[in-house]
Amino acid sequence: MTNWGPTGELVYNRTYSRTKPDGSKETWPETVRRVVDGNLALVDERYHLPGERADLIRLMEEFKILPGGRHLWASGVKNAQHLFNCWVSGWTEKPSDHFEFTFMRLMEGGGVGANYSNRFIDYGPVQQELYVHIVCDPDHPDYEAMKEAGVLSTEYDPDWAGAFVIEDSREGWAAALVDLIDTHYRDEVSHFQRVYDVSRVRQFGAKLKTFGGTASGPLPLARMLIDVCEILSEIATEGGQLTGIAAMEIDHAIAQCVVAGGVRRSARMSMMHWKDPQVYEFLRIKQDTGSHWTTNISLEVDDEFWVAVEEGWAGPNNRILRELTEGMVANGEPGFWNSSLSNVGEPNEVVCTNPCGEITLEPWEPCNLGHVNLAAFAHGNGSYDITGLYRAHRLVTRFLMRATFSPVADPKSREVLDRNRRIGVGHLGVASFLALCGWKYSEARTNEEFKWLLRSLAEEVDHAATQFAHQLRIPVPVKKRTVAPTGTIAKMPGVSEGIHPIFSRYFIRRVRLSMSDPDQTRMLADYGRQGYEVEDDLYAKFTGVVSIPTQDTLVAEVIEHYGQDSESLVESAADLSLNELLGFQALYQTIWADNAVSFTANVDPETYNADDVRQQLRLFGGLLKGATIFPEASMPQAPYERITKEQYEQATAKAVADGVDEDCANGACPIR
């Protein structure tokens, strides 16, 4: 019997349970066996430990270890073992390489980070002003919708011999984008009218077998090609060069195309260096344009930045910090990323993080994540299973190292993956673990036993990685430990997410389900019949929202073990100061994570202003590889809404274990 968290089975069925050949859905034990067997098959059986398969199955079924979402979705799937959640897209001598890589990884269901600092982007003038014409067979089911949207050419038709016929595949879509961008950069072009035939692209709503979800049809692709052409043609008309901001606009157009299906999600991270000539435009790009909603925004800082801030607190560097912190307090962006601190211990330069910020990566490199659920090893009487924790960390390390042998689509990624073998062993359920051990979250920084435990577990990971690398005759992973937000993963066992404190002891949790997916549509109907409030999403098409009054189950667990007066052991985000939140992140960054820590410090904008945040960043800036500070603002259909204990008791409630927002902008990851 699976011991689900209160919304765990819903999240599992929505996100990770695959449809079997007979049309039925996987159960959790079936998913676990698929994932474990797929992972073990990546290396020869002689490299398996005695009983390793049985141990992995048991620990995963009990939610004591959980690999990253891509592993749960794709491991063991024939011809589709795309096991890596996120990537960094770099820049080569050919501008289309970056955009092709971004498009392909997003279409595979991954997230992509990129550094748009202009020092990376030097391609000379855009040579050609072009015009895109979209043509389509009138018998295509989406023809009328495309005609109504105004994207079809009035000058060309599908019979024109010079049309570029777009094949109905990820590679086919990307080939059309590459053709367009490369043509913009050619010295000589015979045809300035670029005609793209979308007749072979499957219709809107068709099922996508490999990655799940439904097809968006040819309309979003047509719009993307038109948008990209307009961006580059405007630059060509002015005799200009591609800039970091313009490249962001192209990637935004690409991401909009990918998410248009209603089920598929994309996640992106955009960075720019603090000394870049476009930095002020970058810092305000979302507010000023109302666009770029497909990406998170983070400012690249370094040691020079923090020195300059201290030496010239009232100077221009403070202006950048002021813009940064005013944005944080207003809407949670930008965050910052410390490239100097992140490059310590790296054999080659890392240029960006994945969209959630827990892994710093070289160009083309993927993140490779797995997690140990600390809460599952707490006995609830002040003790914990230290032997079990060691075993779990050792097995997750080996699991992720085997995953580095999985196929990747791009040879640039293969080269860096083989060279670095980077893994990210992380924790979830940390706040739950602390409370069940009788320790307060706010006191963890001075808790010597907890700090000893983190150091000991880090040593176990490092030892296991070194030992296994020598057996496999591969390089020891350049870095091994991280903290991911685990927003979706943690919901299955119903524990706190990553190292975040719980959101609130009592709250309304809103679950979003896609109306484009038949299974999720049935879930919406079931919730409505049970009396829950169900409404259309105000922010996303084809999406419904279910509101569930909630008591965080950690409260009940702690009271069960420590008595009615122990509720104060469970500290929520609202109980903690910004200093305590950033201090906890710094603890994990300095003791546990050689990669990075993804963490969102939620603050009340009525309590903290930009000056308050600036002072805290001055204290912690040199210790943290990155930070995201998010204002808790009341908004319609917020994923979480605090309520009082009395309000909860008055409601018809289901106990739900939860933490922070699943939305990537709030520090968690929508990529499964």
UniProtKB/Swiss-Prot annotation:
Query: What UniProt keywords apply to this chain's record, in alphabetical order?
Result: Cobalamin, Cobalt, Disulfide bond, DNA replication, Oxidoreductase, Redox-active center
Q: What is its EC number?
A: 1.17.4.2
Active-site residues, as the UniProt record annotates them = C356, E358
Molecular-function GO terms, alphabetical: cobalamin binding; nucleotide binding; ribonucleoside-diphosphate reductase activity, thioredoxin disulfide as acceptor; ribonucleoside-triphosphate reductase (thioredoxin) activity
Recorded hits in Pfam families, A to Z, give:
Ribonuc_red_lgC, RNR-II_ins_dom, RNR_Alpha
Cofactor(s) the protein requires to work: adenosylcob(III)alamin
InterPro entries in UniProt: RdRp_reductase_class-2 (IPR050862), RNR-II_ins_dom (IPR054158), RNR_alpha_hel (IPR040763), RNR_lg_C (IPR000788), RTP_Rdtase_AdoCbl-dep (IPR013345)
On the tree of life, the source organism's domain of life is Viruses
Covalent S-S links between cysteines: C86-C367
Which GO BP terms apply?
A: DNA replication
Q: Which reaction does it catalyse?
A: a 2'-deoxyribonucleoside 5'-triphosphate + [thioredoxin]-disulfide + H2O = a ribonucleoside 5'-triphosphate + [thioredoxin]-dithiol
Q: Which family does the record assign?
A: Belongs to the class II ribonucleoside-triphosphate reductase family.
Database matches in NCBIfam families? RTPR (TIGR02505)
Q: What is the protein's given name?
A: Putative adenosylcobalamin-dependent ribonucleoside-triphosphate reductase
